[in-house]
From Swiss-Prot:
One of its GO terms (cellular component) is plasma membrane. It comes from Pseudomonas putida (strain ATCC 700007 / DSM 6899 / JCM 31910 / BCRC 17059 / LMG 24140 / F1). UDP-N-acetyl-alpha-D-glucosamine binds at residues 15-17, 127, 166, 191, 245, 264-269, 290. PANTHER family: GLYCOSYLTRANSFERASE, UDP-N-ACETYLGLUCOSAMINE--N-ACETYLMURAMYL-(PENTAPEPTIDE) PYROPHOSPHORYL-UNDECAPRENOL N-ACETYLGLUCOSAMINE TRANSFERASE 1. Coiled coil: none annotated. This is UDP-N-acetylglucosamine--N-acetylmuramyl-(pentapeptide) pyrophosphoryl-undecaprenol N-acetylglucosamine transferase. Its EC number is 2.4.1.227. Its main location: membrane. It is a peripheral membrane protein. Cell wall formation. Catalyzes the transfer of a GlcNAc subunit on undecaprenyl-pyrophosphoryl-MurNAc-pentapeptide (lipid intermediate I) to form undecaprenyl-pyrophosphoryl-MurNAc-(pentapeptide)GlcNAc (lipid intermediate II). It comes from the Bacteria. GO terms for biological process: carbohydrate metabolic process; cell division; cell wall organization; lipid glycosylation; peptidoglycan biosynthetic process; regulation of cell shape.
């Protein structure tokens, strides 16, 4: 354990979209001599990733309320009070100089407990539309960090920081000019794979003239990779289909164009890598936050926003033909994406935490 006054508590859980930016900040705190502890819940991905990172993980019992039955709703106040008390006990034991929350069910009770203990609370919102817990915690927070501008209402607390992403994803601007080789298309469906994209891309690419057709690397998810490869084979399109991508920096460095969903971290990584994209937001995401994320790049001309409901194979093929016939357009989009990146996001978030911790 670090010396007195050198503990920091990070709260993040549930999905990688919350946990990965938090891990980036955890490493930055450690570089500056702080001991990082983590507050999570028993069911989230943090139970795998946080111990792998060598960080102590403290658990509280809390879950979401959306879509739950009447009995769960009746129990909710008691469950939340219990979670707050559990978090307060952990905070009193650790005596952190600040508490930094990234979202997930753990953040609500943990944020309330931080306020009860008199520990400065900083929250970070990864999406362009703030989650419920973060919205409710704004009045209790010393600072509120947002990845995208104007996610929160204007106030003295608000800071636009960007999303912390791994430094290796910030790419050198130099790529082999497209005129000297075939274009390279990277398709990302997330760790589980996005089946609508898995069905859409083979059909769309079959409608792109063979002379114009790009090299294709398609990450389809473990369940869907075999059938996706078969779909490409059936329409006569060459593609490398994989369940996962272990080295995202290498994949981004290879690509000229990306087709993917619009999760907050993905959007930030595309900017970091300086990659143009065609974004198909998950249509049923909470508060439609993926559409708002995609608009950040699309408004500036770094991406095309393609709603799933109105994007079929013909529409996607038309858009692909448009940019593949105009490689200079892809170059302009890439430069715009790179200008929207926030390479200092991780250090900025940590600076803000230490500013409120130590005045």
């Amino acid at each position: 354990m670090a010396a007195e006054g050198k503990n920091v508590l990070i709260m993040a859980g549930g999905t990688g979209g919350h946990v990965f930016p938090a891990l980036a900040c955890a490493r930055e705190f450690q570089k500056r001599g702080y001991s990082v502890h983590w507050l999570g819940t028993p069911r989230g991905i943090e139970n795998e990733l946080v111990p792998q990172a060598g960080l102590p993980l403290h658990l509280i019992q809390v879950s979401g309320l959306r879509g739950k039955g009447k009995l769960s709703l009746l129990k909710a106040p008691f469950t939340l009070v219990k979670a707050v008390l559990q978090a307060r006990r952990i905070i009193r034991q650790l005596k952190p100089v600040c508490v930094l929350g990234f979202g997930g069910y753990v953040t609500g009770p943990g944020g309330v407990a931080a306020r009860l203990c008199g520990v400065p609370l900083v929250i970070h919102e990864q999406n362009a539309r703030a989650g419920t817990a973060n919205r409710l915690l704004v009045p209790l927070s010393a600072r509120v960090c947002e990845a995208f501008p104007n996610t929160f209402e204007a106030s003295d607390k608000r800071r636009t920081t960007g999303n912390p992403v791994r430094p290796e994803l910030f790419m050198d601007a130099q790529r082999v000019p497209l005129g000297e080789r075939r274009a390279r298309l990277l398709v990302l469906g997330g760790s589980l794979g996005a089946e609508p994209l898995n069905k859409l891309l083979p059909k769309a690419l079959s409608e792109v003239p063979a002379a114009l057709r790009p090299e294709v690397f398609h990450q389809a998810g473990k369940q869907h990779a075999p059938i996706t490869a078969e779909r490409y084979h059936e329409v006569g399109v060459e593609a490398q289909v994989e369940p996962f991508i272990n080295d995202m920096a290498q994949a981004y460095g290879w690509a000229d164009l990306v087709v993917c969903r619009a999760g907050a971290l993905t959007v930030s990584e595309l900017a970091a890598a300086g990659l143009p994209s065609m974004l198909v937001p998950l249509p049923h995401a909470i508060d439609d936050h993926q559409t708002h994320n995609a608009q950040y790049l699309a408004r500036e001309g770094a991406a095309f926003l393609m709603p799933q409901a109105t994007t079929g194979a013909a529409q996607l093929a038309e858009r692909l033909n448009e940019v593949l016939m105009q490689p200079e357009k892809l170059n302009v989009m890439a430069g715009t994406a790179r200008r929207l990146a926030k390479p200092a996001a991780t250090s900025t978030v940590v600076d803000i935490c230490l500013e409120v911790a130590h005045g």
